[in-house]
Amino acid sequence: MPRAGVAASAFKLRNIWHIHNLHRVRSQQTRLMSDSVEEFSSVFQHAKKVVVLTGAGISAESGIPTFRGEGGLWRDFDATELATPGAFAANPSLVWEFYHYRRTIVAGASPNAGHYAVAALQRRCRRLGKDFILLTQNIDGLHAKAGSTDVVELHGSLWETRCCHCKAVEANRNMPICPALDGKGAPDTVHEANIPSMQLPRCNKCNGLLRPRVIWFGECLERDVLRRTDDALQGCDLLLVVGTSAVVYLFWRNMMEVELHTDFVESLLQDDRLRSRIGLALREKSQYLLVAFRRFKFQGPSSVKLPTALGIGEDELAEMKET
């Protein structure tokens, strides 16, 4: 990957559209943002390569819990405690119960209008000859269920496993994934998770212990995912960010090597340490800021705001649900 890779691509974006309710945009930035559907439609018409990045917010309206913060715990844990290699090594039974519960929730969930709007946008882009790439931080598979294709799943998938021994990756939608997990994983049940290792999901090839094929805290993205993300952002001139505030995640690792040619949405940074480093970089290139950068912010539920902003009506959404 080129040294500036993902970072350079991201900073050359001319437009960022950000639907969110996760943070407050500072007053001076708010003045620079537009909620005009007409203006956004004009920008979309001129875009040649459209990239959509989605996060937990788009699936929350389908009833998918985030397991973060107060009220979002599974038993006495949040995801940062269970979604780690160390937690799996220490108690694979507990981690598999957690993921069995997540698979159960997702298996009973349906895509919402936000997912269908993204699928409709992909179809529209292809019809108009525009490049379209969908990147998602979600592991639920609801975009594919809504009709989106070639989805880049940044954090992996609940519906795939990887062998801890031979590293084989396989799709697995069995519910339960193994007999020992049947009836396990209830969020309000506090008991010792002690399913014997040999009764947990095992590899069909070598009988090694399986783990969910998801990216856990402390792990790097897979090499192929990084390559596809870099390819997606190369030449992208319209980035739509839906249901997440973590767009910086796409290019942070190379950020300090990049010559900034456009403004950066500082409010997307949640980490004070990162914010201070980016702030310094922005000030050093202040002559470039806010010159050719148009931003849009449509705040509210993505299932409502996304179809409206994209001009996707009820008939088109209904058609997507039927296909």
Curated annotation (Swiss-Prot):
GO cellular component: cytosol; mitochondrion; nucleus
Annotated coiled-coil segments of the chain: none
Residues involved in Zn(2+) binding: C163, C166, C203, C206
GO molecular function list: histone deacetylase activity, NAD-dependent; NAD+ binding; protein-glutaryllysine deglutarylase activity; protein-malonyllysine demalonylase activity; protein-succinyllysine desuccinylase activity; zinc ion binding
Active site, UniProt feature: H155 (proton acceptor)
Compartments, as annotated in UniProt: Mitochondrion
Keywords on record: Metal-binding, Mitochondrion, NAD, Transferase, Transit peptide, Zinc
A Pfam family the protein falls into: SIR2
InterPro entries found in the cross-reference section: DHS-like_NAD/FAD-binding_dom, NAD-dep_sirtuin_deacylases, Sirtuin, Sirtuin_cat_small_dom_sf, Sirtuin_class_III, Ssirtuin_cat_dom
EC number(s) recorded for this UniProt protein: 2.3.1.-
Required cofactor(s): Zn(2+)
Entry note: cofactor: Binds 1 zinc ion per subunit.
The UniProt record lists the keyword DNA-binding: no
Sites where the protein binds substrate: Y99, R102
Catalytic function, reaction form: N(6)-malonyl-L-lysyl-[protein] + NAD(+) + H2O = 2''-O-malonyl-ADP-D-ribose + nicotinamide + L-lysyl-[protein]; N(6)-succinyl-L-lysyl-[protein] + NAD(+) + H2O = 2''-O-succinyl-ADP-D-ribose + nicotinamide + L-lysyl-[protein]; N(6)-glutaryl-L-lysyl-[protein] + NAD(+) + H2O = 2''-O-glutaryl-ADP-D-ribose + nicotinamide + L-lysyl-[protein]
Domain of life per record: Eukaryota
Binding site for NAD(+): 55-74, 137-140, 243-245, 302
Transit peptide: 1-33
Domain Deacetylase sirtuin-type: residue ranges: 34-323
Keyword Transmembrane: no
Family (UniProt): Belongs to the sirtuin family. Class III subfamily.
Free-text function comment from the UniProt entry: NAD-dependent lysine demalonylase, desuccinylase and deglutarylase that specifically removes malonyl, succinyl and glutaryl groups on target proteins. Has weak NAD-dependent protein deacetylase activity; however this activity may not be physiologically relevant in vivo.
PANTHER family, per database record: NAD-DEPENDENT PROTEIN DEACYLASE (PTHR11085:SF13), NAD-DEPENDENT PROTEIN DEACYLASE SIRTUIN-5, MITOCHONDRIAL-RELATED (PTHR11085)
HAMAP family: Sirtuin_ClassIII (MF_01121)
Record's comment describing the protein's domains: In contrast to class I sirtuins, class III sirtuins have only weak deacetylase activity. Difference in substrate specificity is probably due to a larger hydrophobic pocket with 2 residues (Tyr-99 and Arg-102) that bind to malonylated and succinylated substrates and define the specificity.
Name the record gives this protein: NAD-dependent protein deacylase
Origin species: Physcomitrium patens
